[in-house]
Curated annotation (Swiss-Prot):
Residues 59-88 are annotated as: Disordered. The modification Phosphoserine is found at S64, S82, S93. It is found in: Virion membrane; Host apical cell membrane. It comes from the Viruses. Forms a proton-selective ion channel that is necessary for the efficient release of the viral genome during virus entry. After attaching to the cell surface, the virion enters the cell by endocytosis. Acidification of the endosome triggers M2 ion channel activity. Pfam families: Flu_M2 (PF00599). It comes from Influenza A virus (strain A/Tokyo/3/1967 H2N2). GO terms for molecular function: monoatomic ion channel activity; proton transmembrane transporter activity. Residues 71-80 have a biased composition (Basic and acidic residues). InterPro entries: Flu_M2. Residues 44-97 are intravirion. The record marks H37 as: Essential for channel activity, possibly by being protonated during channel activation, and by forming the channel gate and the selective filter. This is Matrix protein 2. It is a single-pass type III membrane protein.
Length: 97
């Protein structure tokens, strides 16, 4: 089977490609993009559990503290905790009867 932009037709006793502009840069770019899309789609379907598990856990980790002094890390933790403590008063308890 040929590329998506080519049409195979019987010419005399052979199968040949009847393409006028197969060297057109737009046709070549579209073919390359189509092939890459197909490859990425196949890889996504094969490894989707690994890929999405990586993104899910990667997003839950929070900001990186690499290279940050311990005192600044502790200060950041205190700020985060105080923000959580301050928000506790905004919750409303609703009791259903």
């Amino acid at each position: 089977m040929s590329l998506l932009t080519e049409v195979e037709t019987p010419i005399r006793n052979e199968w040949g490609c009847r393409c006028n502009d197969s060297s057109d840069p737009l046709v070549v770019a579209a073919s390359i993009i189509g092939i890459l899309h197909l490859i990425l789609w196949i890889l996504d379907r094969l490894f989707f559990k690994c890929i999405y598990r990586f993104f899910e856990h990667g997003l839950k980790r929070g900001p990186s503290t690499e290279g940050v002094p311990e005192s600044m890390r502790e200060e950041y933790r205190k700020e985060q905790q105080s923000a959580v403590d301050a928000d506790d008063g905004h919750f409303v308890s609703i009791e259903l009867e």
